[in-house]
């Protein structure tokens, strides 16, 4: 195994991509590798509060990341600097467990699912309502509703939460079901290890004999030809046997580079749904649920302040809440909006960029083509109205974080498939139509000046 300090740097690098910036900087950035005792990696946390928080909330993620990098199962032990406490390095009992190279699927489904990620703990909003409904339908009737279910969206918006929720629901209602959740990175590493150890059949038996396969971050298969080949056959085997497949990505299948066309087409067999950033009301609801789950007493004005400042994704939103609570605990002061501002000053940009709304787009497009705002929501199909409306839908998809149903609502309650059609039509025309390119450039320049 490589030097433990180099290993820990790699682990931190991977985790930094997976969690919010506030969470990483608050809990993990200042940690250091201490030693390797048997099968236990000992990590130094900056203080007792951080040690306890890391142990209860991040041990599982860290162990998973170490396994993804090294192929070895290591337990993790957190200590604090000797000058803060006389910490005895007692190894957890899990450190004595010997790892099997390829365990049966039933050996790990529950342990691979985060117990906090259930449908009950998922906060539904306009940006994730469709994805939630599709996930619940799949959980209630695996391989009968949508197969595969492909969920895409930015980092920290709830894709992984929904995948784990599906797994929990299936196991709760059918305890004998073989449910496997893993990242595409882990799938790749296990496949490489299987080839190296000359045990490909063990690997295939593990993943081709499950009832539900939940595979996260499929975009990381891009460019890995052998792994794509293996996953292609795994997909076919499961689909032919009516086993449920759920896939997540940060982008839709057609936008994943160097993904084989045969995989891309199979990902499009079922239902593709996106998740977009939560609106203000949803962000406040998320903070309330998180505070209740963790037993935090947070004033409403503080939650409103955090929700107004952090609008990118759920991980950063919850990370900001944790940072405020940690800051309050460490300096022993009551949580107020002023304290929250102080705690978050390093992660909130001083000047937030102007957010373009659908209404902004409709107004500017309407002025450009000399049509009324109400025409965007009307049923008129004349070209003088329909074409600008399609351009506005295209720009709403490109320049806002609104979901397809939300965009459709803002254009007179149109179906999300109408929005998809408009986006695809304008995208195709832009490749050859110089006049349309000119219109779009002028409209976007006006939007920048708002």
UniProtKB/Swiss-Prot annotation:
Protein residues bound to ATP: 156, 158-160
Annotated segments matching region Domain III, AAA+ region: 112-328
Listed transmembrane segments: none
Region ranges (Domain IV, binds dsDNA): 329-450
Recorded GO MF terms: ATP binding; ATP hydrolysis activity; DNA replication origin binding; lipid binding
NCBIfam families on file: DnaA (TIGR00362), PRK14086.1 (NF010686)
Name under which the protein is recorded: Chromosomal replication initiator protein DnaA
The organism's taxonomic lineage, starting at the top: Bacteria, Bacillati, Bacillota, Bacilli, Bacillales
């Amino acid at each position: 195994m490589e030097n433990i300090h180099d290993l820990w740097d790699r682990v931190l690098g991977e985790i930094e991509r997976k969690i919010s910036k506030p969470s990483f900087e608050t809990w993990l950035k200042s940690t250091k590798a201490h030693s390797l005792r048997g099968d236990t990696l000992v990590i130094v946390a900056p203080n007792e509060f951080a040690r306890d928080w890391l142990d209860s909330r991040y041990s599982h993620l860290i162990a998973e990341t170490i396994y993804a990098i090294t192929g070895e199962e290591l337990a993790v032990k957190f200590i604090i600097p000797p000058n803060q406490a006389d910490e005895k390095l007692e190894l957890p009992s899990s450190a004595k467990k010997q790892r099997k190279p390829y365990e049966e699927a039933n050996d790990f489904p529950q342990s691979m699912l985060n117990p906090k990620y259930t449908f009950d703990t998922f906060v539904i909003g306009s940006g994730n309502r469709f994805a939630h409904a599709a996930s619940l339908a799949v959980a209630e009737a695996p391989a009968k509703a949508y197969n595969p279910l492909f969920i895409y969206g930015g980092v920290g918006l709830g894709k992984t939460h929904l995948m784990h929720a599906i797994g929990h629901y299936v196991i709760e209602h059918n305890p004998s079901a073989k449910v496997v959740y893993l990242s595409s990175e882990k799938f790749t590493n296990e496949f490489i290890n299987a080839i190296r150890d000359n045990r490909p059949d063990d690997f295939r038996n593990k993943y081709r004999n499950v009832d539900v396969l939940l595979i996260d971050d499929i975009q990381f298969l891009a460019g890995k030809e052998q792994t794509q080949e293996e996953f292609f056959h795994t997909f076919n085997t499961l689909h032919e046997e009516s086993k449920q497949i759920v896939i997540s990505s940060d982008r839709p299948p057609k936008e994943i580079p160097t993904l084989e066309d045969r995989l891309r087409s199979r990902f499009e067999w079922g239902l593709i749904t996106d998740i977009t950033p939560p609106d203000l009301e949803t962000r406040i609801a998320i903070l309330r649920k998180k505070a209740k789950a963790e037993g935090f007493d947070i004033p409403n004005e503080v939650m409103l302040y955090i929700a107004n400042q952090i609008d990118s994704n759920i991980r950063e939103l919850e990370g900001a809440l944790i940072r405020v609570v940690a800051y309050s605990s460490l300096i022993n002061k009551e949580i107020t909006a002023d304290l929250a501002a102080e705690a978050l000053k390093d992660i909130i940009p001083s000047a937030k960029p102007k957010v373009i709304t659908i209404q902004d787009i409709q107004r500017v497009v309407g002025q450009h083509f000399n049509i009324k705002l109400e025409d965007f929501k009307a049923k008129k199909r004349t070209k003088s109205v329909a074409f600008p409306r399609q351009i506005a839908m295209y720009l709403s998809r490109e320049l806002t974080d609104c979901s397809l149903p939300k965009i459709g609502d803002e254009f007179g309650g149109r179906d999300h498939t109408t929005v998809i059609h408009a986006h695809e039509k304008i995208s195709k025309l832009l490749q050859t139509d110089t006049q349309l390119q000119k219109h779009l450039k002028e409209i976007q320049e006006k939007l920048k000046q708002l």
